[in-house]
């Protein structure tokens, strides 16, 4: 694929030598739930904004870029390390759990133009997609992504599309029932949104198997042999010509690192990660129960260790996006 000089410039700002080692902290609903588990009452705006600032201050020196949201993360954008690029999220958090459609929705007071003016080097939008889902729902979702792609083209800024697969008939994505479908769901969605009419520059995707069911990665029930898991990663590489990066999906830092080694050995030429909770999740209970200073200490020690180890893994496993663009 080819991109404009401006888009290439911005992609270089969010990566290091073609590898995207990005820190994801655009969580809103999930972060509120994590905080609420350690205190009485809901998390306050100040609590959320402050933790985002702490993470940005302490960990962005070791990340090629950080993904934040404009609802609670604008203060954090101001304190990131000078060389660290910025992705801003464009979607509202969560989805309507009373329906299976999971239709996308933008932050209504924002546009790509405004996110760019706020300092974004790239735009990220999250889409829930069931490749086998209701045809009319999927047509709506495709049209929605076309609009965002057109906005990003008009502003000449990279479009990162985050795809989260699901099945309209299965409520638990961690279930064995969904694990059997996951390779098809993940790779099928990637194939759909690689069409150039969507204007996507980089895909942010799940690994195509649930590693908790892979032979050699679990002491419980196995739903993928090693060979089947390898095939899923190979099919993922074949599903798109676009650069793609992995999300950590809330798994532990150790499992995520092991997964990246497995993916690379299988032939997946991913160009980095947007890693969130696997890096910073442990700071949340410390921040809520012990305060800012202790949270900062955690980020400087365990948080740094998580991101430093991940960077070392990426050096050995990731392929530069420049090989595809």
Curated annotation (Swiss-Prot):
Signal peptide: none annotated. It catalyses: D-tagatofuranose 1,6-bisphosphate = D-glyceraldehyde 3-phosphate + dihydroxyacetone phosphate. Disulfide bonds: none annotated. GO terms for molecular function: 6-deoxy-6-sulfofructose-1-phosphate aldolase activity; tagatose-6-phosphate kinase activity; tagatose-bisphosphate aldolase activity. Pathway: Carbohydrate metabolism; D-tagatose 6-phosphate degradation; D-glyceraldehyde 3-phosphate and glycerone phosphate from D-tagatose 6-phosphate: step 2/2. One of its GO terms (biological process) is D-tagatose 6-phosphate catabolic process. Keywords: Lactose metabolism, Lyase. Belongs to the aldolase LacD family. NCBIfam families: lacD, PRK04161.1, PRK12399.1, PRK12858.1. PANTHER family: SULFOFRUCTOSEPHOSPHATE ALDOLASE. This is Tagatose 1,6-diphosphate aldolase 1. It comes from Streptococcus pyogenes serotype M1. The lineage of its organism: Bacteria, Bacillati, Bacillota, Bacilli, Lactobacillales. The gene is lacD1.
């Amino acid at each position: 694929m080819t991109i404009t000089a401006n888009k290439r410039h911005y992609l270089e700002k969010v990566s290091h030598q073609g590898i995207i080692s990005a820190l994801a902290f655009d969580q809103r609903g999930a972060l509120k739930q994590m905080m609420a588990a350690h205190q009485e009452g809901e998390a306050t705006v100040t609590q959320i904004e402050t933790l985002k600032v702490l993470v940005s201050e302490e960990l962005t020196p070791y990340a090629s870029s950080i993904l934040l949201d404009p609802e609670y993360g604008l203060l954090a954008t101001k304190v990131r390390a000078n060389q660290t690029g910025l992705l801003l999220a464009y979607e509202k958090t969560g989805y309507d759990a009373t329906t299976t459609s999971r239709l996308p929705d933008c932050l209504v007071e924002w546009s790509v133009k405004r996110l760019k003016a706020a300092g974004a080097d790239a735009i990220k939008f999250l889409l829930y997609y069931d490749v086998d889902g209701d045809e009319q729902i999927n047509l709506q979702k495709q049209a929605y992504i076309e609009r965002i792609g057109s906005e990003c083209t008009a502003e000449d800024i990279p479009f990162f599309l985050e795809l989260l697969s699901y099945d309209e008939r299965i409520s638990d994505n961690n279930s064995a029932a969904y694990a059997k479908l996951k390779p098809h769901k993940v790779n099928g969605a990637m194939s759909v949104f690689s069409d150039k009419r969507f204007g996507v520059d980089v895909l942010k995707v799940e690994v195509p198997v649930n590693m908790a069911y892979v032979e050699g990665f679990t002491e419980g029930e196995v739903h993928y042999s090693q060979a089947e898991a390898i095939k899923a990663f190979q099919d993922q590489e074949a599903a798109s010509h676009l650069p793609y990066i992995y999300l950590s999906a809330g798994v532990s830092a150790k499992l995520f690192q092991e997964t990246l080694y497995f993916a690379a050995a299988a032939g997946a030429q991913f160009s980095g990660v947007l890693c969130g909770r696997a890096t910073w999740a442990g700071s949340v209970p410390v921040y809520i129960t012990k305060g800012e200073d202790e949270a900062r200490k955690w980020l400087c020690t365990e948080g740094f260790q998580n991101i430093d180890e991940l960077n070392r893994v990426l050096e050995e496993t990731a392929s530069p996006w420049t090989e595809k663009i």
